[in-house]
């Protein structure tokens, strides 16, 4: 177990060390035509991965591990021509390509069918920290085929060189227990306030806010592994289209 946690730490440090600071391209590329869709995309990225089943940990449970989300392509902005629409707040849509963000999350089981969680990450020039609560609508059941509904609420703060953001989301999750895996489906809403600190070509945008609300749906599978480990793989759909998320956690 100690070796596994050491490898996670080393991989995380390597990612930070060799990252390309992608989020620092914001001030060079943000425009009135792409800022709103960027706020929507950012909300979808931050809000993903807050759950991996519809089942709570239960009183005294604890879980920790790395998680990550990927957006395969950022949303198009507004504009009269294709080149303008493809110019995102991080650069040309095709050149930017997939956007990945990792973080470390810790969860703890509390009384009254409530779990609390905190998570944080710093990658490619953006730092995110936040947390939330999960509430099991029904009592946890070990019966195969049992449905487990859950409500999730979360809040985050994000900071980069040229922008900052606050983010709130709420989701409803439903999972079904099988012997070796747990499929889950969820839907939620992300609300993001984007504050612009720097805009090289549109200085009038500096100091202004953009407000964005977007829906997000998730479909995934959670697998119970040996040594109290869980592997979760999921696809989600938000304003930017298709994305993915994964986690590898250990339960105590």
Go through each PLM region and give its residues.
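Transmembrane beta-barrel domains of Gram-negative outer membranes and organellar outer membranes
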Residues: 20-141
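Predominantly the C-terminal beta-signal and adjacent terminal strand-loop region
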Residues: 20-30, 211-213, 224-252
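Short loop/turn motifs that connect adjacent beta-strands in outer-membrane beta-barrel proteins
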Residues: 53-60, 138-148, 179-181, 225-228
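Residues on the lipid-exposed face of transmembrane beta-strands in outer-membrane beta-barrel proteins
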Residues: 53-55, 66, 104-110, 131-135, ...
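Hydrophobic, lipid-facing positions within transmembrane beta-strands of outer-membrane proteins
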Residues: 60-62, 100-104, 127-135, 149, ...
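Solvent-exposed loop/turn segments connecting transmembrane beta-strands
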Residues: 95-101, 117-131, 158-166, 211, ...
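Transmembrane beta-strand segments that form the barrel wall of outer-membrane beta-barrel proteins
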Residues: 106, 110-124, 146-157, 174, ...
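Outer-membrane beta-barrel translocator/channel fold
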Residues: 151-222
């Amino acid at each position: 177990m100690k070796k596994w946690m050491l490898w996670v730490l080393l991989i995380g440090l390597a990612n930070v060390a060799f990252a390309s600071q992608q989020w620092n391209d914001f001030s060079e590329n943000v425009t009135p035509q792409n800022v709103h869709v960027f706020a929507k995309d950012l909300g979808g990225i931050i809000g993903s991965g807050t759950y991996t089943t519809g089942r709570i940990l239960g009183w005294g449970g604890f879980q920790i591990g790395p998680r990550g989300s990927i957006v395969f392509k950022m949303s198009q902005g507004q504009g009269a021509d294709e080149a303008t629409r493809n110019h995102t707040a991080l650069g040309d849509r095709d050149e930017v390509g997939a956007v990945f963000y990792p973080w470390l999350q810790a969860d703890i089981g509390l009384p009254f069918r409530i779990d609390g969680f905190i998570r944080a990450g710093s990658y490619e020039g953006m730092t995110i920290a936040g947390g939330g609560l999960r509430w099991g609508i029904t009592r946890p059941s070990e019966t195969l085929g049992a449905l487990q509904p859950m409500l999730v609420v979360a809040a985050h703060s994000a900071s980069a060189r040229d922008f900052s953001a606050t983010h709130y989301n709420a989701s409803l999750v439903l999972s079904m227990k099988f012997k070796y895996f747990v499929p889950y489906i969820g839907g939620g809403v992300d609300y993001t306030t984007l504050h612009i600190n720097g805009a090289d070509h549109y200085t009038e945008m500096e100091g202004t806010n953009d407000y964005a609300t977007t829906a997000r749906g998730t479909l995934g599978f959670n697998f119970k592994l040996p040594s109290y480990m869980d592997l979760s793989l999921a696809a989600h759909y938000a304003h930017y289209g298709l994305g993915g998320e994964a986690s590898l956690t250990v339960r105590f």
